[in-house]
From Swiss-Prot:
This is Photosystem I reaction center subunit IV. InterPro entries: Elect_transpt_acc-like_dom_sf, PSI_PsaE. SUPFAM superfamilies: Electron transport accessory proteins. GO terms for cellular component: photosystem I reaction center; plasma membrane-derived thylakoid membrane. It is a peripheral membrane protein. The keyword Thylakoid applies. It is found in: Cellular thylakoid membrane. Belongs to the PsaE family. Its main location: membrane. Stabilizes the interaction between PsaC and the PSI core, assists the docking of the ferredoxin to PSI and interacts with ferredoxin-NADP oxidoreductase. GO terms for biological process: photosynthesis. Keywords: Membrane, Photosynthesis, Photosystem I, Thylakoid. Gene3D superfamilies: 2.30.30.50.
Length: 70
């Protein structure tokens, strides 16, 4: 399961960011169809750099980095 801060690869073929890697900004637990918000480095034609995806449209590439202990 993806979590905030994970690096994910996009598997949705009609997406501008298909096969690109982005960072998970948030995951909604309320039961909506596209609960995962992913932020990308590059922008699409409209100047947008985030999009919502379903969990089955994502593959986790890298787990989030652990926060350093104080």
């Amino acid at each position: 399961m993806v979590q905030r801060g994970s690096k994910v690869r996009i598997l949705r073929p009609e997406s501008y960011w298909f096969q690109d890697v982005g960072t998970v900004a948030s995951v909604d637990q309320s039961g909506i169809k596209y609960p995962v918000i992913v932020r990308f480095e590059k922008v699409n034609y409209s100047g947008i750099n985030t999009n919502n995806f379903a969990e089955d449209e994502l593959v986790e590439v890298e787990a989030p980095k652990a926060k350093p202990k104080k």
